[in-house]
């Protein structure tokens, strides 16, 4: 179905690459050195698809990072474009502050020292 790889010179300097995606891209892919990558918009839509189903901490973490570049409305718009028959905007706004499933999930190693409690508060402030 898919595969994960850690790419880098050693354990402390690496990134995780997941190859799990089989759906057609809705947003144009990005091509770097003849390698096709999903766009940020595509990734954001995928993250909201997971959040719509309960979400994991890493998905909230990733969306929180995307909020440095995009608005919450932008990110929800990417999801709706990708999933026109999926969750509504109001349903997503409810899910983006429902941390019940993610609460028991492992806490990602954050290289920016972000805190889970602050991330939750930021989402709650955005949805108010």
Positions of PLM-derived features:
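Compositionally biased terminal segments of proteins
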Residues: 1-128
């Amino acid at each position: 179905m898919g595969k994960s790889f850690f790419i880098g010179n050693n354990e402390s300097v690496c990134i995780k690459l997941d190859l799990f995606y089989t759906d057609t891209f809705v947003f144009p892919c990005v091509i770097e050195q003849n390698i096709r990558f999903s766009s940020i918009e595509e990734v954001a839509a995928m993250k909201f698809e997971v959040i719509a189903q309960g979400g994991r901490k890493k998905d909230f973490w990733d969306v929180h990072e995307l909020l440095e570049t995009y608005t919450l409305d932008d990110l929800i718009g990417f999801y709706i474009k990708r999933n026109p028959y999926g969750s509504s905007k109001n349903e997503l706004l409810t899910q983006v502050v429902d941390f019940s499933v993610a609460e028991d999930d492992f806490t990602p190693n954050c290289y920016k020292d972000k805190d889970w409690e602050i991330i939750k508060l930021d989402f709650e402030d955005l949805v108010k």
